[in-house]
Protein backbone atom coordinates (compact mmCIF):
# COMPACT_ATOMS: atom_id res chain seq x y z
CA UNK A 1 0.00 0.00 0.00
CA UNK A 2 1.25 3.47 -0.90
CA UNK A 3 0.49 6.94 0.42
CA UNK A 4 0.86 10.28 -1.39
CA UNK A 5 2.47 12.51 1.24
CA UNK A 6 5.42 14.08 -0.58
CA UNK A 7 7.01 13.70 -4.00
CA UNK A 8 10.19 12.63 -2.22
CA UNK A 9 8.56 9.20 -1.82
CA UNK A 10 8.13 8.66 -5.58
CA UNK A 11 10.49 7.86 -8.42
CA UNK A 12 10.52 9.96 -11.57
CA UNK A 13 8.93 7.03 -13.41
CA UNK A 14 6.08 6.84 -10.90
CA UNK A 15 5.45 10.59 -11.05
CA UNK A 16 5.25 10.49 -14.84
CA UNK A 17 3.07 7.37 -14.69
CA UNK A 18 0.55 9.18 -12.47
CA UNK A 19 0.64 12.22 -14.76
CA UNK A 20 0.01 10.06 -17.83
CA UNK A 21 -2.95 8.43 -16.07
CA UNK A 22 -4.25 11.87 -15.08
CA UNK A 23 -4.01 13.09 -18.67
CA UNK A 24 -5.90 10.01 -19.87
CA UNK A 25 -8.64 10.62 -17.30
CA UNK A 26 -8.82 14.29 -18.29
CA UNK A 27 -9.05 13.47 -22.00
CA UNK A 28 -11.86 11.00 -21.31
CA UNK A 29 -13.79 13.58 -19.28
CA UNK A 30 -13.51 16.12 -22.11
CA UNK A 31 -15.12 13.51 -24.39
CA UNK A 32 -17.93 12.96 -21.90
CA UNK A 33 -16.53 9.62 -20.77
CA UNK A 34 -16.49 8.97 -17.02
CA UNK A 35 -15.29 5.42 -16.37
CA UNK A 36 -16.22 4.38 -12.79
CA UNK A 37 -12.64 3.64 -11.80
CA UNK A 38 -13.47 3.92 -8.09
CA UNK A 39 -17.05 2.66 -8.14
CA UNK A 40 -18.53 2.54 -4.65
CA UNK A 41 -15.32 3.75 -2.97
CA UNK A 42 -15.50 6.31 -0.14
CA UNK A 43 -12.97 9.14 0.26
CA UNK A 44 -12.76 10.62 3.75
CA UNK A 45 -11.67 14.27 3.50
CA UNK A 46 -10.25 15.71 6.72
CA UNK A 47 -9.91 19.49 6.65
CA UNK A 48 -8.05 21.07 9.55
CA UNK A 49 -7.37 23.96 7.15
CA UNK A 50 -10.15 25.34 4.96
CA UNK A 51 -9.87 25.49 1.18
CA UNK A 52 -11.76 26.24 -2.02
CA UNK A 53 -9.83 24.33 -4.68
CA UNK A 54 -8.87 21.34 -2.53
CA UNK A 55 -12.38 20.57 -1.34
CA UNK A 56 -14.16 21.12 -4.67
CA UNK A 57 -11.57 19.21 -6.72
CA UNK A 58 -11.36 16.17 -4.43
CA UNK A 59 -15.11 15.98 -3.84
CA UNK A 60 -15.95 16.40 -7.54
CA UNK A 61 -13.15 14.02 -8.47
CA UNK A 62 -14.26 11.09 -6.34
CA UNK A 63 -17.88 11.52 -7.53
CA UNK A 64 -16.75 11.55 -11.17
CA UNK A 65 -14.88 8.30 -10.51
CA UNK A 66 -18.04 6.63 -9.22
CA UNK A 67 -17.30 6.99 -5.52
CA UNK A 68 -18.36 9.46 -2.87
CA UNK A 69 -16.61 12.02 -0.69
CA UNK A 70 -17.17 12.61 3.01
CA UNK A 71 -16.22 16.10 4.24
CA UNK A 72 -14.88 16.10 7.81
CA UNK A 73 -13.88 19.34 9.51
CA UNK A 74 -12.56 19.74 13.05
CA UNK A 75 -16.12 20.56 14.09
CA UNK A 76 -17.35 17.23 12.73
CA UNK A 77 -14.85 14.82 14.29
CA UNK A 78 -13.08 14.36 17.61
CA UNK A 79 -9.73 15.59 16.26
CA UNK A 80 -11.00 19.08 16.96
CA UNK A 81 -11.57 18.10 20.59
CA UNK A 82 -8.13 16.63 21.15
CA UNK A 83 -8.43 12.99 20.08
CA UNK A 84 -4.96 11.70 19.11
CA UNK A 85 -4.31 11.49 15.38
CA UNK A 86 -3.33 7.83 15.67
CA UNK A 87 -6.71 6.97 17.21
CA UNK A 88 -8.60 8.91 14.55
CA UNK A 89 -6.58 7.13 11.86
CA UNK A 90 -7.31 3.67 13.21
CA UNK A 91 -11.04 4.39 13.36
CA UNK A 92 -11.65 6.28 10.12
CA UNK A 93 -9.44 4.02 7.98
CA UNK A 94 -11.64 1.04 8.93
CA UNK A 95 -14.68 2.82 7.49
CA UNK A 96 -13.47 4.45 4.25
CA UNK A 97 -11.34 3.40 1.28
CA UNK A 98 -8.98 6.38 1.16
CA UNK A 99 -8.28 9.52 3.19
CA UNK A 100 -7.27 13.00 2.09
CA UNK A 101 -5.95 15.32 4.78
CA UNK A 102 -5.34 19.08 4.66
CA UNK A 103 -3.58 20.10 7.85
CA UNK A 104 -0.77 22.17 9.36
CA UNK A 105 2.21 20.21 10.64
CA UNK A 106 3.48 17.56 8.23
CA UNK A 107 4.12 15.26 11.17
CA UNK A 108 0.34 15.05 11.68
CA UNK A 109 -0.31 13.50 8.29
CA UNK A 110 2.72 11.22 8.71
CA UNK A 111 1.30 9.94 11.99
CA UNK A 112 -2.12 9.38 10.41
CA UNK A 113 -0.54 7.45 7.53
CA UNK A 114 1.50 5.33 9.95
CA UNK A 115 -1.67 4.03 11.61
CA UNK A 116 -4.00 4.06 8.59
CA UNK A 117 -5.23 0.89 6.91
CA UNK A 118 -5.97 2.78 3.67
CA UNK A 119 -3.99 5.12 1.38
CA UNK A 120 -3.57 8.70 2.60
CA UNK A 121 -3.27 11.73 0.28
CA UNK A 122 -1.68 15.01 1.33
CA UNK A 123 -4.07 17.83 0.40
CA UNK A 124 -1.61 20.33 1.91
CA UNK A 125 0.62 20.66 4.95
CA UNK A 126 2.85 23.50 6.09
CA UNK A 127 5.81 21.62 4.59
CA UNK A 128 4.50 20.25 1.28
CA UNK A 129 1.74 20.67 -1.30
CA UNK A 130 2.42 17.77 -3.70
CA UNK A 131 -0.99 17.57 -5.39
CA UNK A 132 -0.57 21.18 -6.51
CA UNK A 133 2.80 20.43 -8.06
CA UNK A 134 1.32 17.54 -10.02
CA UNK A 135 -1.27 19.97 -11.40
CA UNK A 136 1.44 22.50 -12.20
CA UNK A 137 3.53 19.96 -14.07
CA UNK A 138 0.55 18.64 -16.03
CA UNK A 139 -0.08 22.23 -17.10
CA UNK A 140 3.56 22.51 -18.16
CA UNK A 141 3.30 19.27 -20.13
CA UNK A 142 0.23 20.50 -21.97
CA UNK A 143 2.15 23.60 -23.03
CA UNK A 144 5.27 21.69 -24.08
CA UNK A 145 7.21 23.08 -21.12
CA UNK A 146 8.37 19.71 -19.80
CA UNK A 147 11.45 19.29 -22.00
CA UNK A 148 14.42 20.48 -19.93
CA UNK A 149 12.53 23.51 -18.62
CA UNK A 150 13.92 26.32 -16.51
CA UNK A 151 11.46 27.10 -13.71
CA UNK A 152 11.75 30.27 -11.64
CA UNK A 153 10.00 30.42 -8.29
CA UNK A 154 9.80 33.93 -6.80
CA UNK A 155 8.57 34.50 -3.26
CA UNK A 156 8.37 32.80 0.11
CA UNK A 157 10.33 29.62 0.79
CA UNK A 158 7.19 27.77 1.84
CA UNK A 159 5.43 24.46 1.17
CA UNK A 160 5.14 25.29 -2.53
CA UNK A 161 8.88 25.94 -2.73
CA UNK A 162 9.62 22.67 -0.95
CA UNK A 163 7.40 20.78 -3.38
CA UNK A 164 9.04 22.46 -6.38
CA UNK A 165 12.41 21.41 -4.96
CA UNK A 166 11.28 17.79 -4.78
CA UNK A 167 9.69 17.77 -8.24
CA UNK A 168 12.71 19.37 -9.92
CA UNK A 169 15.17 17.08 -8.17
CA UNK A 170 13.17 13.98 -9.11
CA UNK A 171 12.52 14.89 -12.76
CA UNK A 172 15.91 16.48 -13.40
CA UNK A 173 15.03 20.00 -14.57
CA UNK A 174 16.45 23.39 -13.60
CA UNK A 175 14.82 25.25 -10.72
CA UNK A 176 15.79 28.73 -9.58
CA UNK A 177 14.36 29.88 -6.26
CA UNK A 178 14.41 33.58 -5.35
CA UNK A 179 13.43 34.59 -1.82
CA UNK A 180 14.19 37.57 0.42
CA UNK A 181 16.87 36.98 3.04
CA UNK A 182 15.38 35.15 5.99
CA UNK A 183 12.63 33.56 3.90
CA UNK A 184 14.66 30.80 2.28
CA UNK A 185 13.26 27.25 2.10
CA UNK A 186 13.83 24.82 4.96
CA UNK A 187 17.54 23.93 4.94
CA UNK A 188 17.00 20.22 5.53
CA UNK A 189 14.53 19.96 2.65
CA UNK A 190 16.82 22.00 0.39
CA UNK A 191 19.77 19.72 1.17
CA UNK A 192 17.62 16.62 0.55
CA UNK A 193 16.64 18.03 -2.83
CA UNK A 194 20.27 18.75 -3.70
CA UNK A 195 21.22 15.14 -2.93
CA UNK A 196 18.46 13.82 -5.18
CA UNK A 197 19.42 16.37 -7.85
CA UNK A 198 22.99 15.05 -7.88
CA UNK A 199 21.57 11.73 -9.10
CA UNK A 200 18.96 13.05 -11.56
CA UNK A 201 21.01 15.84 -13.12
CA UNK A 202 18.71 18.59 -11.87
CA UNK A 203 20.18 22.04 -11.34
CA UNK A 204 18.84 23.86 -8.29
CA UNK A 205 19.94 27.36 -7.34
CA UNK A 206 18.91 29.64 -4.49
CA UNK A 207 19.21 33.42 -4.80
CA UNK A 208 17.96 36.65 -3.25
CA UNK A 209 17.70 38.27 -6.69
CA UNK A 210 14.36 37.74 -8.48
CA UNK A 211 15.74 39.09 -11.76
CA UNK A 212 18.54 36.56 -11.77
CA UNK A 213 16.04 33.76 -11.17
CA UNK A 214 13.57 34.81 -13.87
CA UNK A 215 16.02 35.68 -16.66
CA UNK A 216 15.54 33.20 -19.53
CA UNK A 217 13.01 31.07 -17.62
CA UNK A 218 10.35 28.94 -19.33
CA UNK A 219 8.02 29.00 -16.34
CA UNK A 220 7.60 31.71 -13.71
CA UNK A 221 5.64 30.93 -10.57
CA UNK A 222 4.93 32.44 -7.18
CA UNK A 223 2.67 32.12 -4.15
CA UNK A 224 1.08 34.36 -1.57
CA UNK A 225 3.55 36.16 0.70
CA UNK A 226 1.57 35.37 3.86
CA UNK A 227 0.13 31.86 3.99
CA UNK A 228 -2.77 30.71 6.14
CA UNK A 229 -1.80 31.15 9.79
CA UNK A 230 0.65 33.98 9.04
CA UNK A 231 -1.91 36.80 8.96
CA UNK A 232 -0.19 38.64 11.83
CA UNK A 233 3.00 38.83 9.75
CA UNK A 234 1.23 40.25 6.70
CA UNK A 235 2.44 43.86 7.01
CA UNK A 236 6.04 42.89 7.80
CA UNK A 237 6.12 40.42 4.94
CA UNK A 238 4.73 43.05 2.55
CA UNK A 239 7.74 45.23 3.41
CA UNK A 240 10.26 42.40 3.28
CA UNK A 241 9.00 41.16 -0.10
CA UNK A 242 9.30 44.50 -1.91
CA UNK A 243 10.81 43.79 -5.33
CA UNK A 244 9.40 40.27 -5.43
CA UNK A 245 6.14 41.08 -7.22
CA UNK A 246 5.92 39.26 -10.55
CA UNK A 247 4.98 42.24 -12.70
CA UNK A 248 5.36 42.84 -16.43
CA UNK A 249 8.93 44.09 -16.02
CA UNK A 250 10.03 40.96 -14.15
CA UNK A 251 8.04 38.64 -16.41
CA UNK A 252 9.66 40.35 -19.39
CA UNK A 253 13.02 38.89 -18.36
CA UNK A 254 11.73 35.36 -18.95
CA UNK A 255 11.55 33.80 -22.41
CA UNK A 256 9.01 35.44 -24.69
CA UNK A 257 6.84 32.31 -24.64
CA UNK A 258 7.19 31.71 -20.90
CA UNK A 259 4.10 30.82 -18.89
CA UNK A 260 3.01 32.09 -15.48
CA UNK A 261 1.63 29.80 -12.77
CA UNK A 262 0.11 30.49 -9.34
CA UNK A 263 -1.57 27.97 -7.05
CA UNK A 264 -4.16 30.57 -5.90
CA UNK A 265 -5.61 32.40 -4.11
CA UNK A 266 -3.68 35.32 -5.59
CA UNK A 267 -3.38 38.80 -4.13
CA UNK A 268 -3.18 41.26 -6.98
CA UNK A 269 -0.59 43.97 -6.51
CA UNK A 270 1.35 41.92 -3.97
CA UNK A 271 3.05 38.76 -5.23
CA UNK A 272 1.75 39.31 -8.79
CA UNK A 273 0.42 42.25 -10.76
CA UNK A 274 -3.06 42.36 -12.24
CA UNK A 275 -1.52 42.67 -15.71
CA UNK A 276 0.46 39.44 -15.42
CA UNK A 277 -2.30 37.52 -13.66
CA UNK A 278 -4.84 38.39 -16.34
CA UNK A 279 -2.35 38.38 -19.21
CA UNK A 280 -1.89 35.89 -22.05
CA UNK A 281 1.03 34.12 -20.36
CA UNK A 282 -1.03 33.32 -17.27
CA UNK A 283 -2.41 29.78 -17.13
CA UNK A 284 -3.69 29.94 -13.57
CA UNK A 285 -7.19 28.69 -14.32
CA UNK A 286 -6.00 25.80 -16.50
CA UNK A 287 -3.65 25.02 -13.62
CA UNK A 288 -6.50 25.18 -11.09
CA UNK A 289 -8.66 22.86 -13.22
CA UNK A 290 -5.81 20.40 -13.44
CA UNK A 291 -6.04 19.89 -9.69
CA UNK A 292 -9.23 17.93 -10.43
CA UNK A 293 -7.59 15.71 -13.02
CA UNK A 294 -4.31 14.94 -11.26
CA UNK A 295 -6.05 14.17 -7.99
CA UNK A 296 -8.29 11.70 -9.79
CA UNK A 297 -5.14 10.16 -11.25
CA UNK A 298 -3.49 9.99 -7.84
CA UNK A 299 -6.53 8.36 -6.24
CA UNK A 300 -6.89 5.77 -8.99
CA UNK A 301 -3.15 5.00 -8.94
CA UNK A 302 -3.14 4.53 -5.16
CA UNK A 303 -6.29 2.42 -5.28
CA UNK A 304 -4.73 0.13 -7.88
CA UNK A 305 -1.57 -0.25 -5.80
CA UNK A 306 -3.71 -1.31 -2.87
CA UNK A 307 -5.52 -3.99 -4.87
UniProtKB/Swiss-Prot annotation:
It is an enzyme of class 2 (transferase). Pathway: Amino-acid biosynthesis; L-arginine biosynthesis; L-arginine from L-ornithine and carbamoyl phosphate: step 1/3. Carbamoyl phosphate binds at residues 51-54, 78, 102, 129-132, 263-264, 291. The keyword Cytoplasm applies. Its main location: cytoplasm. It catalyses: carbamoyl phosphate + L-ornithine = L-citrulline + phosphate + H(+). L-ornithine binds at residues 159, 223, 227-228. Keywords: Amino-acid biosynthesis, Arginine biosynthesis, Cytoplasm, Transferase. It is found in: Cytoplasm. One of its GO terms (cellular component) is cytoplasm. Its EC number is 2.1.3.3. One of its GO terms (molecular function) is amino acid binding. InterPro entries: Asp/Orn_carbamoyltranf_P-bd (IPR006132), Asp/Orn_carbamoylTrfase (IPR006130), Asp/Orn_carbamoylTrfase_sf (IPR036901), Asp_carbamoyltransf_Asp/Orn-bd (IPR006131), Orn/put_carbamltrans (IPR002292), OTCase_ArgI (IPR024904). One of its GO terms (biological process) is citrulline biosynthetic process. NCBIfam families: orni_carb_tr (TIGR00658), PRK00779.1 (NF001986). Belongs to the aspartate/ornithine carbamoyltransferase superfamily. OTCase family. Reversibly catalyzes the transfer of the carbamoyl group from carbamoyl phosphate (CP) to the N(epsilon) atom of ornithine (ORN) to produce L-citrulline. HAMAP family: OTCase. PANTHER family: ORNITHINE CARBAMOYLTRANSFERASE, MITOCHONDRIAL, ORNITHINE TRANSCARBAMYLASE, MITOCHONDRIAL. This is Ornithine carbamoyltransferase. It comes from Wolinella succinogenes (strain ATCC 29543 / DSM 1740 / CCUG 13145 / JCM 31913 / LMG 7466 / NCTC 11488 / FDC 602W). The lineage of its organism: Bacteria, Pseudomonadati, Campylobacterota, Epsilonproteobacteria, Campylobacterales. The gene is argF.
Amino acid sequence: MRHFLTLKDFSAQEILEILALSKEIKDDLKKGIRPPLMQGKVLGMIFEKSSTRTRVSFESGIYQLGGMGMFLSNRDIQLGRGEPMKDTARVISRMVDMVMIRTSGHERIEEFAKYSQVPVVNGLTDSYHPVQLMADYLTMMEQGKDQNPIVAYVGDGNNMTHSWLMLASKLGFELRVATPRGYEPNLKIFEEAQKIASLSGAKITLTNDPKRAVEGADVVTTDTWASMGQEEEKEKRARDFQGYCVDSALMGLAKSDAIFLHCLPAYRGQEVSEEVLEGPQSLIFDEAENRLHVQKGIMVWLDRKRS
